[in-house]
């Protein structure tokens, strides 16, 4: 009787275990899979705080040069200037341009520049649902990983437009949200390399930057090309260097 009772208990335990594994635990297993997938997706990035940043990190006087909308026709020239002056920078690329110019992205990564996520095709994120915003961010990062085997740990919303949803999406992906504190408005040149635009870009960078200890400078290397930005960049670098700034990435 004792052995039969023990056998019955053991059989019941097996049945219950099978039932739990096959049915009751499915949500838990799915949740665990989701956690593992998120961990894999965010591997390599430090934890990100909630909120948006506009000032360069680091002690003392620091400046961060950032380039949006690339890679584009002026990217190669910008890389040459940065290399010549041995200056770090951050590129907030767009997914469609990453797919179109993968070799330039690989050059950016190989040279040690930071990669930022500027969405897949630069929409106004405030007009999109949370799911659509997530797809814009994730699709860009997936393309970046496929092309250069890296993940962007920084995110910049197109046009600087964002709501709380974007901040949460970025934080869950261990991506810091970066805006800017110095706007060169170089995009207004629209492909022109005239001295007027070069001087204007330099003037805005110097006027806005000189009053800040930690400026984040916004420039572009859009597909149409920005020759005025390329011409202004050496002057901007020399200006900040002469005023005691240390160049950093975001």
Language-model regions, residue ranges each:
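Terminal accessory/targeting
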Residues: 1-65, 80-90, 213-250
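Hydrophobic residues in alpha-helical membrane-spanning segments
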Residues: 28, 103, 158-159, 235
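Active-site beta->alpha N-cap acidic-glycine motif
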Residues: 36-128, 132-152
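Active-site-proximal beta-strand/loop segments in catalytic clefts of secreted hydrolases
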Residues: 67-70, 92-96, 119-120, 156-160, ...
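Divalent metal-coordination and catalytic microenvironments
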Residues: 68, 82, 91, 115-118, ...
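Alpha-helical structural signal in soluble globular domains
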Residues: 81-85, 104-107, 111, 143-147, ...
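Residue-level detector of anion-binding/catalytic polar loops
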Residues: 88, 114, 176, 183, ...
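Alpha-helical scaffold elements lining the catalytic groove of polysaccharide deacetylases
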Residues: 123-150, 161-213, 228-231
């Amino acid at each position: 009787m004792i052995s039969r009772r023990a056998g019955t208990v053991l059989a019941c335990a097996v049945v219950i275990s099978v039932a739990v594994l096959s049915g009751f635990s499915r949500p838990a297993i799915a949740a665990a899979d989701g956690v593992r997938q998120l961990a894999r997706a965010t591997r390599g990035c430090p934890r990100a705080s909630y909120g948006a940043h506009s000032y360069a990190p680091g002690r003392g006087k620091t400046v961060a040069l950032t380039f949006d909308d690339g890679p584009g026709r002026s990217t190669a020239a910008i890389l040459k200037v940065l290399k010549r002056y041995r200056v770090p920078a951050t590129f907030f690329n767009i997914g469609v341009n990453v797919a179109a110019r993968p070799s330039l992205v690989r050059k950016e990564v190989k040279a040690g520049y930071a990669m930022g996520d500027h969405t897949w095709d630069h929409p106004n994120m405030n007009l999109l649902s949370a799911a659509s915003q997530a797809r814009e961010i994730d699709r860009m990062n997936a393309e970046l990983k496929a092309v250069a085997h890296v993940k962007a740990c920084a995110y910049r919303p197109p046009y600087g437009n964002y709501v709380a949803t974007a901040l949460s999406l970025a934080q869950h992906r261990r991506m810091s949200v970066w805006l800017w504190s110095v706007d060169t408005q170089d995009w207004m040149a629209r492909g022109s390399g005239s001295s007027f635009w070069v001087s204007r870009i330099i003037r805005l960078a110097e006027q806005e930057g000189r009053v800040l200890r930690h400026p984040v400078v916004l420039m572009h290397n859009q597909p149409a090309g920005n020759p005025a930005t390329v011409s202004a960049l050496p002057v901007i670098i020399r200006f900040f260097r002469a005023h005691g700034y240390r160049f950093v990435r975001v």
